[in-house]
Structures are given as structure tokens and as C-alpha cells.
């Protein structure tokens, strides 16, 4: 009888409560063992004995639990994996907190290293068994049910898969490729999850650009927030903040490269989001700025800056390798594997990608240094006889133009963008360390083992003074026939490493630029810089008291404390009318309107015949010109209407009394004198008071609702609907009538015995 898959298998067991036999599915929560998996924590950064002991104890629990899990039979294993939430949290904590190979770390104790290796192996075997649906011919799960179990129970997701690739891809590539391929094959829904995850991955690049104060892709920019207007550039931000950005970029690039290297079938999903163009534009905008920021901080922490430069170089290399993997998977491999009839679409895709990147000159130059574009185009020419030569020539010409002014031979030999020179001829980056160069040349097979060592470079300040003289003397003591100028050139080339200079000179392995120099070249002594005090510039430069620019100073104008000549100086200053006399003639020119124009005998007005008009000019007659205090009494009377003095008026109105238009009209009708009653009519007084109250309420905007029907009917006869509504309205709005919870407070007093009930 053939064995049934685990998802269809039924097992018979005894009910612990009734003692009777019953049948239940093999995958059931009751089959789960009662075991708690503790969370993983990373090893301590400081080798403090107490922290190391705590880590070893916790890691031992995790390792023992995983070993117990791996030893379970097929059905028990899957019940524990599916229904035990603590197991999933334990595995997630390991993927999240375990140190990556490119993370900062210190030398751990040997027992910590051994425990890390044991945990690493146990976690990998656990995920490997979780991704296998058939262990043997008797223990397996049907493929359709296996995919549903993985997807519905969140045993795998895209972030977990990315972490698995970056953690276990080195050394376990075949097993990891089979594992992830099986997951995507049995559950195609992970492709849609990856498609939904890619906008988040692209947002990582946008966040880095925004945090660096760089403008991203114009098609994807959003309105800028007010608090984002003052963002710092990489050159201005603090060093620790720059360090966080570089580490974040290094982690992102390494993770994406590891995933695409393990599972290249995901390249199609990446390219759906125009990933190649977004990657190249990010490289062009961010990488040069970060390089410049590191180079400008040469005088700061050299060890930290060397580590940042190494990680940035590693990130650059991974970005270009990601681009190459995608290009190779979606264009080049299909061309090599397909027939001649089916390759035109892939060739068009290749040409379209590079046509969109022609303005990214820095990216093209660095990519061409690692993966020559001419070789790929040569492959296209061999595969297709109808290739558009105009487009290919245009792309090659754009790549060549990106190399203008750059030492291409040096960059191609290095096979790394960190040694490429800028168009101005200066090295693009900090000098590469001699140790990294020697290791790369003598052990090329180890370059792939240390992924983080790609293009290792260190930042160091330029030597000068006593330090430089000491280095030159170290070399000259062993090689006295060499000139100091030649030794200085060698030290500058090999980053001031005297051991490397001596070794290369003795082994005749100097760089070509150094071999052409004269070995007896003398050292050129640089002139001393200008002293600071003789080159200062401020607001007192070259004044009468500047002792740095003149030898003699008028000491009579220098006094200590209060000057004795202050009174004389003040009086002489007030009596000095030279400034007034100098301005008098200028202001006299403004008096162009005069009553009489003095003329010499026989002279006439030169402008009389031109500007004279016999018509009277009344333009300004209606304007009041001049001050009122200089006017005569007649003019004041003519301008101001005559009014009766207050003392002569028959009726004196009260000051500050404001009356409306309606009241004025009523007063106009009642101007006749009224008899003075000793006691006025109360009805008239009530009408006036009511009128004043209604006028006041009208000004306040209040409208009294006179349609109240709260009287109601006698008790026992029921109430009308209007009465009920009015009572409800009165109860809801009683606060407007100064009823401050009287019923509530009265009940409270009565309940406390204040008022006898």
C-alpha cells in the first residue's frame, strides 16, 4: 500500500481524557510538544566575562532546542514548525540579530566563536528541512499542500529569504539555490510578494538620497517638507551620521547581491520596476558625494575613515555586480541559449537599457572597468546579423566619452573603481593601502573569500615635518645611495610605508612612474609659509594705529583712561560749521520760487517767452497748503463751519451716548416739550423697558423662543407631544438658564442628611 502524504495522513491515538481511541489528522495542534524556544541575542561586543557567560548560556539553550527539533520524526517536526510560535520567533531573532560578515566586530573568545558556528549550522539545517517537502518515499507532503503550508503559516517570506541568502550564501550556494528554488516553485505567490517588496527596496535608495540632501529621480520626487529644507550634505553632516549611512548602504547592496546571485530568476521581477535605471541614477548621485565627504575628512579619525572607504568601495562593487547580474539574466543568457529567431527582443532590451544610461558617465566608466561593454556588444554582433550598428556605435562612443581625461589603463588593471582617476587627473579616492594591493596580487584566489575586502583603502593625512624626515631617514639608512627626493616620491606613492618602499626597491618591483625617476634626485625644500601675524586682514587693517603696517604711531592721540581734552574737543566740534557751509550752496539751489528775480540793466527773462501763459492756474486752489498755526482768523472761519457753543445750546446731549438711526427718527417726531409728570405711567415704563430689552437682545443675536409648552396637563391625564419635547429641551439646555445642577445638589444634600426627608 503506497504511503499517504502527511497532509492526508490520519493517525489513531488514545484520548487522554476518555481513554478511548480516536482518529485525528497527523498535522494537528495536539501533536505539538510543549517546549519553549528562547530568543537569540548577538554575542557581546566587549569580552566581559559576565556577558560572555550569559551569551553562552542562552546560545546553548537555542542550540539544544534546535538539535532536539531536527531529531524529531517527520510528522512531529512539521507539527512543531507549524503550530509553535516560539520556534518562529527564535528563528526570526537569529536572522535579525546575528552578525553579518561585513559588520563591525571585535575578536571574540574561542568559545563564543565555536558556539556561533554551532548555531549557524543548526539554524541552516532547520530552514533547509523546512523547505523540503519530500524527505523519503514514506515521509513527504504533497507539493500543493506544501506551498499552502509555507505561505499561510508565514514559514518563509521575502525578508527571511533575503537574510538567508546573505547569511548562508557563502559556502552553501548549491543547497541554498535548491532550497529557494523549491520555495518559489511550490508557491508562486512569493513572486507577487517580491513584486510588492521592490518599491520598498527602491525606497531605501530614495531615503539615502534624501538623508544626504541629494535630489533623487525627478519622476519620483515628492513635495519637499518644510523640516527637510535644511538637510546636510555628506560633507557637512557629522562623522557618525555618515558612518550610519555608509553601513546602511553596504548592508543593502550586499543583501541584494547575495539574493540575486543565489536566485537569478528574480531578475525579471526586478526589471519590471526599471531597477537598472534607478540603480545607475542612485550610483551617479550618491557615490561621488560620499567619496568626496570621506576625502575631505582626512584629518579626522583615520582608522574609522579607512573602514568607511573600504565599505563604500565594497558597496560600489556590489552595485555594479547587481547591474551585471540583471543584465546578464534578462538579456545576455537568453541570447546565448535561444535561436536566431527569438533573440531580437533581448537585443532590443539590452540596447534600451544602455541607451537610458548614457548620461550617467561615472557609472558607465566604473561598470566598463569591471565588465567591458565592448565585449557584450561584440557578443550581440556575433549573435545577430541584423544588429543596428548605429545604436551600438553610439553606445560605444558614449562609453568612450565617459573615459575622457581618465587613466583607463590603470583603472582596467586594478579592476576596481576606487583607483580610477577623475577627469582632472587627480586620483579618485584615497590611496590604496599597500597591504591590500600586495594581498590581491599574491593571493588572487582569496579575493572572493573576503567579500568585504574589495578595493580596501585607508585614509591617512599627508606626512610633513619631523614625521616625514623620520620616514626618509629610515629608508636612507638602509639605502644610502638614494636621493631624498626619490625616497619622498616612493613614500608618497606607497602611502608613506617605508617597509613597502624598501621591499619594492630591493626586489626591483617599483611602479613604472617611479622607475623612470632619477634615483639621485634631491629633495626640494619648500619655503616656509607666511607668518600668520603679517598676513592678517581685519577692519583695522592699515589704520593709523596698525603697528604691523607702520613703524611710528602718533602717541599724542593715545591716552589711558578719561581724556582731559574732552570738553575742548566737544566745544570745537560744535563750533565747527564747515559742513553746514559746504551744504548751504546746495540747499540754496532748491529755492527756485522767488518773489523777485534780480536782473542786470538790459537783461530779460530767457524763459519768459516760452513758458509764460496768461491763463490763471487754479490746480492747487482747493488744497490746504501750509500749517494751520500760521493762518489768519478769517481763513480758519472760512474753512470751518460755524457751530453754536455748548453753553448756548438749548439741549445738551450726554457724552458717549450712541443712538441708532431708528431712535433718531423717533426723537425727531417727539421734539416738542413734554410735561414733567411726577409719576409716569407704569405701562409706558414697562413698554420702554421691554423695547430696550428686545433691542439689546437683537444686538446680541438672541431670539427668545416663546413657543414653550411646559405647563402640561394635570397628573394622570398624560402629556402632549409638544409638552414632552419642550421639557426634554429644557432639561438639555437648563445650563443656559442659570440652573447649575440644583436638583443634583439638592439630592446630594438630602442623601447626606443635611435636609430631613
Curated annotation (Swiss-Prot):
Residues 657-670 have a biased composition (Acidic residues). GO terms for cellular component: cytosolic ribosome; DNA repair complex; nuclear speck; nucleoplasm; nucleus; RQC-trigger complex. Pfam families: CUE. Coiled coil: none annotated. Residues 617-687, 699-757 are annotated as: Disordered. Ubiquitin-binding protein involved in DNA repair and rescue of stalled ribosomes. Plays a role in DNA damage repair as component of the ASCC complex. Recruits ASCC3 and ALKBH3 to sites of DNA damage by binding to polyubiquitinated proteins that have 'Lys-63'-linked polyubiquitin chains. Part of the ASC-1 complex that enhances NF-kappa-B, SRF and AP1 transactivation. Involved in activation of the ribosome quality control (RQC) pathway, a pathway that degrades nascent peptide chains during problematic translation. This is Activating signal cointegrator 1 complex subunit 2. It comes from Homo sapiens (Human). The lineage of its organism: Eukaryota, Metazoa, Chordata, Craniata, Vertebrata.
